Amino acid sequence: MKRDALSALGLASHVAARLADRSRARQVREALEAGQLDVHYQPKIELRSQRVSGVEALVRWRHPTRGLLAPAAFLPTDEHDGPMVELTAHVLDVAIGQAAEWRRRGVSLSVAVNISAASVADERLAGTIDALLRRFDVPARQLVLEITETAVLRDPEGCAELLHEIAGAGVSISLDDFGTGQSSLSRLLRLPIHELKLDREFVRAMSAGHDKDRLVHAILTFAHDLGHRVVAEGVEDRAMLDRLADLGCDEAQGYYICRPLPADELPDWVLRPRGAADRLFSRPLGAGAWEKPFRAPAVAWR
């Protein structure tokens, strides 16, 4: 009897989740059609040079009554649901077009775009990206595609083939939320990955004790041995940033560095002079690596 009740409860929860996802998918489609989805950009810094190395494009919904909403508040939890291919194409269009506009203003930054699981399974993705890069005259090296381990799981071989085609054209591939998925390392090694994004849970856990530091150090060593760069996300304070620099992390992003900005605000943030009050790191570290305050005006390629 108890087992039957638990099974019924589990089924009810699953049905409720599916209905919620369908409702969210419908809302996303309506927001797309109404032109209510904007793209904001969160800067990333290269820890050794302390330069702005690029930005991540993050979708926001200008809800007519609830204000500006982050993705967690409106995207379906199942990335294969509804209009995720259309949403990914929209963000790619906006982000690549914005990169071209910034280039005209003297700010050349790599732009990372999150690619939904549905889009990774879409054989049209490579053609869509190529057409957008040509249309806006943006170099392929300026675009980074962020994929998750979960997106790879449904069709590993097909995903690998598509990503090799895209990477062969010069676009960088980033594995997002590394360490949170269930994909085998052997499978990941077959993908043309250029960087790993260290999940924010690993970054936050560093403050919990030395064992967590050793785990992050092991991930960094593993990635660097394979020739991959590592980006830490979710950096919330100076202690986190200092520790990541000590451990040899390549890049970082988070609210401590800068919140996601509307496109028209980003150039001013990147180009404004920085003084002592803007110093992100608490002390010089290593052999001359941190001799100066963080200098955002010096824009660096990945």
What would you call each of these model-derived segments?
Residues M1-A20, L47-R48, P64, S116-A121, ...:
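EAL-family c-di-GMP phosphodiesterase catalytic domain
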Residues K2-V138, A151, R302:
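Bacterial c-di-GMP phosphodiesterase EAL domain
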Residues L75-P76, T128-L132, E161-H164, R190-P192, ...:
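Glycine-rich, phosphate-binding/catalytic loops in enzymes
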Residues M84, A99, L163, L185-L188:
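AlphaC helix (C-helix) of the protein kinase catalytic domain N-lobe
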Residues A99-R103, L133-R134, A160-G168, H217-H224, ...:
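Surface-exposed amphipathic alpha-helices with a cationic face
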